[in-house]
Amino acid sequence: MRAGHRAPSQTHRRPSGGSKRPGRPRRTGRAPPNRPGHHIHTTPSTAAPDERHTGVTMQSRTDAHETVDTAFLAELRSRTPADRVLTSGPEYTRALALFNAAVGVRPSVVVRCASTADVRAGVRASRNHGVPLSVRGGGHDFWGRAFRPGGLVLDLTEMRDVQVDVNHGYATVGGGALSSDVVSAAERAGLTAVTGTAGSVGMVGLTLGGGYGPLLGQFGLAADNLLSAEVVLADGSRVNTDAEHHPDLFWALGGGGGNFGVVTSARIRLHRVPTVISGTILYPIDQSAGILADLGGTLQDSPDELTVDVGFLPGPDGKPTVYVAPTWSGNLEAGNAQNGPVRTLAGLGTPVLAEIGPVARSATLAATDAMFPPGRMGAIRTRTVQSVTGSIATVLGRAAREFTSPFSAIVWHQFHGAATRPTLGSTAFGRREPHLMVELICMWENGENKDHTGGGEDRSSHLRWLEETHAALEPFSLPGGYVNFLGPETPDQVANSYGPNTERLLAVKSAVDPDSVFSATPLPTSTAGA
């Protein structure tokens, strides 16, 4: 299992790319031969079956679209193909499908964007008529920020083009491209991208918030691999930004979240690591004290090539287990050696499961997606700790023994190596010292509730478990947290998440979006908590 790094739907952010307007993008057949300088271009199908689930913020869905301003609709339809402007019907209903079925917000209008021009038209119409704006990329955000009540959604799920430049080692990805789209295209060229652990997460949303993942020890965060971006600003204008052009905006995109515009396409650095040594090791929870103590030293001393996720999740028999998920991105022979740094992790105790070996990165993403399928209800919280001390292990072990659902999990993600080397302030990401990002995931089935009003199985016990665990970790935690997992219910963490970057981020925000058109990812209102 890999807890995916879910990014806030690009509401108030979500990149998009491509310029095809009519209909659905085509999926190309065979990949062209891998030749130096050759460009590999793929356009995935726009509506993968695993994206068809419903949800949003634990609210009832109301027919907000019935009150849509006619002048607003008229402007939208004059600027975009009418069949792409949805206010009701089967296509509109399908467009409401998000990863988290607990979300209940209903937008008034969905525009299925096929180009940057569609995005610009939507932004301008929204501003002209005072309609709240949001952006949907991967739709994986637990908080459901792809939608705003009664608002306009710029749906980028058809903007999933991925173009790989083999010679220069980068990919240009559309704003709606999923992590799996990018990794699959890169693999055909013998390359890979820095992503999180789940393939169904939007690539741009992940990157804008930072992007923890199993390759960060060797290659840094996803945000550290951003080379340039095309951005539609709050006034509807389009800019191309990189380290030399609009450098303040480019800096803000590297971890400042989706606060500055709609990223319609992004160019990201690729790496020649299509195959890794990876797997899952599960230990009985009664061995947790010794295993976590041993892992503490391993995480502190691990080489850049080895990044390890650790945590608790229900095992095959439903009982909680200690979960260890290593990823080795270095020399395969060294990583796969019996006495090497990866396989020794299976000897910390007596595992109930130990599956480790060479695997394509696309397969690791697919495995996480299979463990966390769309359509369940859920909520998330996060903390940041320097290390897993005995006190923290006790808190998390107790929480694991009290799991209220077989679909919940606790995972901490290692932050080390290359990710720690950029100076604080060189990007907008607010923390560069070694640490562990703790992900508390609470998920449960929707039960028999078929109208998607946020009910189904009683959620009170699940949410109580989540909030109590989150609170119990606070005394041992560093200020702030990972912005892609923070929402309106965690304002104190938001205020401390950007550190000394807060003042500069607010200055960029004031320059490019003074009216806060984009606001999905939390941004402090002042430097008071920074």
Feature-to-residue mapping (PLM):
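Soluble FAD-dependent oxygen oxidases
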Residues: 41, 46-530
